[in-house]
Each structure stands twice: as C-alpha cells, then as structure tokens.
C-alpha cells in the first residue's frame, strides 16, 4: 500500500534589477566560479530533497492479534483519539489486550535489516477492536467514556437526545460496544476493509462460544473529524446557514455516520491534536478538529460492510 507525502511549497523571491558590471581580477573570478559551483550543488541537493518528499513509499502491512508488546503503540493511538479528555487510556489498553480474541494490530511486514534504523519491527501502525461497555461497566475507563459522551451530548444536543443516549448506555438488556479503529493518518483507508472483515468474524465466533464481546445491539463510535473553521455544525441551535461538510480522518467512518441513529459533534480545538504520523492539510483552509459520536444499530453492520467492500476493495 502506498502513502503519499505532501510536497513542500517553495517561496519565490521578488526579482531585482541587475547591478552594473564590475571588473574583477583572476583570483576573484575563480572565487566567483567556485561559489557558483557551490550554489549549483546546493540547488541540486534541494531538488533531490523535493524529489524524496514527493515520492511514494510502498509498505506492506500484516495483521496480528493484540499482545503485550503492542501496549505502547495502542495506548499512543488511544491518546490521539481522546487527547486531554479524562479517560484512563492505560486501563483501556490493558482491557483490549486481555481480550485478545477480539481485534488486530497492523504492522509492517518483514522489516529488513537494511531498512531505516528508526523503524521498529513491532511498531503499531493501527489497530481495531471492540470493548463491550455493558460487560465492563464499573471499570474506570468505561465510566469515564460514558461520562465524556454524555457531557458533550448535553452541551451540543437537545435534551431529548441526551435522554435517549443515556437510556441506550444504561440498558443492560441491549449491550453497547465501543468500536475502536485507529491508525496513523498516512495509512490508506483500504486497510480498513480486511480489518473490519476480520473483526466481524471474531465477534461472530465470540457470540457462538459465549465469550466477551459476543453480542452487541449497538456500536458506539467516536470518530476524528474536521470542518472548515468558523462553520457551525452543532445541532443544538438551528441556523439558516448551510452546515459545513464533515470530513473524516478515517474515510470509511462516513458509512457508519450514514447509518447512525444518534450522532453529534464536539470541538477539540483547545486540545493538542498532533495527528500521529502526519499532518492534515485541506488546500490550506483552516480546519476545526472535532470528535463525532455515533450510535449504530448492530443490524446495520452488514449494510456498512457492503459499502466498505464497494468503495475499498483493491
């Protein structure tokens, strides 16, 4: 799979009128020639740098079950999702690794000795998993996540939606699963299809053998999204202005958004969003980072998977 780096913009100077010719002796002329050669070499180096920045790098990925070796990588990606929110990402990472019959991590295939010295063969480029919030109710991280989404729902939505979300999260007869799919920003979305296909197989197997996460009636997804700065996407205060287009960091999550029965956004503008593995650029238009919370019925997953196959099949 190939990821493409954005080419660096080079600022051009304003042309100046030529100076009058100046007489030089032979030594001065040699020095000028040497300086010109140095300038040529420097220009060549800059051109080579630009070529490197603009080149495509092909990396093959492979999926593995979650293990203790993946702790740091998974936790880092979870921190990228929750930012400064009061969520115990260490405990959440532990819970995901403990239930390693569910979920996968993606790593580079066969890191050779000749590759970049900074490349760690165990580096986690992304992961997918699911945590049954109903089964894990009472653990600190689960309580914190539920409080987080309810708090922002109260700030951004009508009272009826807050009550609806609270009811869904506390109905023990219809478990809600927290769907987590995080990856470096420059990992292409095509990787999502096999990851979700494998997750669906694992969830079906867990349901068949009565293991944790086996049955969820709803999926809760917190997605990294962006809107053009200054645009209002809140549903609490209706406006005649057209809502800004919502852009998804993980492109495939738009299909989940379309099937969600409950959804809202909240801003994370004040928090440090470093965008692991890359930087966002939308034609140099200032963007406001958001988190989009969605609740998707479990019986809609087959339709979503069909969409993923249609758009992400290589």
Swiss-Prot record:
Residues 161-259 are annotated as: Interaction with CDKN1A. Its main location: nucleus. Residues 25-56 have a biased composition (Acidic residues). The keyword Endoplasmic reticulum does not apply. It is found in: Nucleus; Cytoplasm, Cytoskeleton, Microtubule organizing center, Centrosome, Centriole; Cytoplasm, Cytoskeleton, Spindle pole. GO terms for cellular component: centriole; centrosome; cytosol; mitotic spindle pole; nuclear cyclin-dependent protein kinase holoenzyme complex; nucleoplasm; nucleus. Residues 1-56 are annotated as: Disordered. One of its GO terms (molecular function) is kinase regulator activity. Expressed at high levels in testis and skeletal muscle and at lower levels in brain, heart, kidney, liver, lung, ovary, pancreas, placenta, and spleen. Residues 59-167 are annotated as: Interaction with BRCA2. The modification Phosphoserine is found at residues 42, 112, 281. During interphase, required for microtubule organizing and anchoring activities. During mitosis, required for the organization and stabilization of the spindle pole. Isoform 2/alpha is particularly important for the regulation of microtubule anchoring, microtubule stability, spindle architecture and spindle orientation, compared to isoform 1/beta. May promote cell cycle arrest by enhancing the inhibition of CDK2 activity by CDKN1A. May be required for repair of DNA damage by homologous recombination in conjunction with BRCA2. May not be involved in non-homologous end joining (NHEJ). Belongs to the BCP1 family. Interacts with BRCA2, CDKN1A and MTDH/LYRIC. Isoform 2/alpha, but not isoform 1/beta, interacts with DCTN1/p150-glued and ACTR1A/ARP1. Both isoform 1 and isoform 2 interact with alpha-, beta- and gamma-tubulins. Interacts with TENT5C; the interaction has no effect on TENT5C poly(A) polymerase function. HT1080 cells that constitutively express low levels of BCCIP display increased levels of spontaneous single-stranded DNA and double-strand breaks. This is BRCA2 and CDKN1A-interacting protein. It comes from Homo sapiens.
């Amino acid at each position: 799979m190939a990821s493409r780096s954005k080419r660096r913009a080079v600022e051009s100077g304003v042309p100046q009128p030529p100076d009058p010719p100046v007489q030089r002796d032979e030594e001065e002329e040699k020095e000028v020639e040497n300086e010109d050669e140095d300038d040529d070499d420097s220009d060549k180096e800059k051109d080579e740098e630009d070529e490197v920045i603009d080149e495509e790098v092909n990396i093959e990925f492979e999926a593995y079950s979650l293990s203790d070796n993946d702790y740091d990588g998974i936790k880092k990606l979870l921190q990228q999702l929750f930012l400064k929110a009061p969520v115990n990402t260490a405990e959440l990472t532990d819970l995901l690794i403990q239930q390693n019959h569910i979920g996968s991590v993606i790593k580079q295939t066969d890191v050779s000795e000749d590759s970049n010295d900074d490349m760690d063969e165990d580096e986690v480029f992304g992961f997918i998993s699911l945590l049954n919030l109903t089964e894990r109710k009472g653990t600190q991280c689960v309580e914190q996540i539920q409080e987080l989404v309810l708090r922002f729902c109260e700030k951004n939505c009508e009272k009826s939606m807050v009550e609806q979300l609270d009811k869904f999260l506390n109905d023990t007869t219809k478990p809600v699963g927290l769907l987590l799919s995080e990856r470096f920003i420059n990992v292409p979305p095509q990787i999502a299809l096999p990851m979700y296909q494998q997750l669906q197989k694992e969830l079906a197997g867990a349901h068949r053998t009565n293991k944790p996460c086996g049955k969820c009636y709803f999926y809760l997804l917190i997605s990294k999204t962006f809107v053009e700065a200054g645009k209002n996407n809140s549903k609490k205060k209706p406006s005649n202005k057209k809502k800004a287009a919502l852009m998804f960091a993980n492109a495939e999550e738009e299909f989940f958004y379309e099937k969600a029965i409950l959804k809202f956004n909240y801003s994370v503008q004040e928090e440090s969003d470093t965008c692991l593995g890359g930087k966002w650029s939308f034609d140099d238009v200032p963007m406001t980072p958001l988190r989009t919370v969605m609740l998707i019925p479990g019986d809609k997953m087959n339709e979503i998977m069909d969409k993923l196959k249609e758009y992400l099949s290589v």
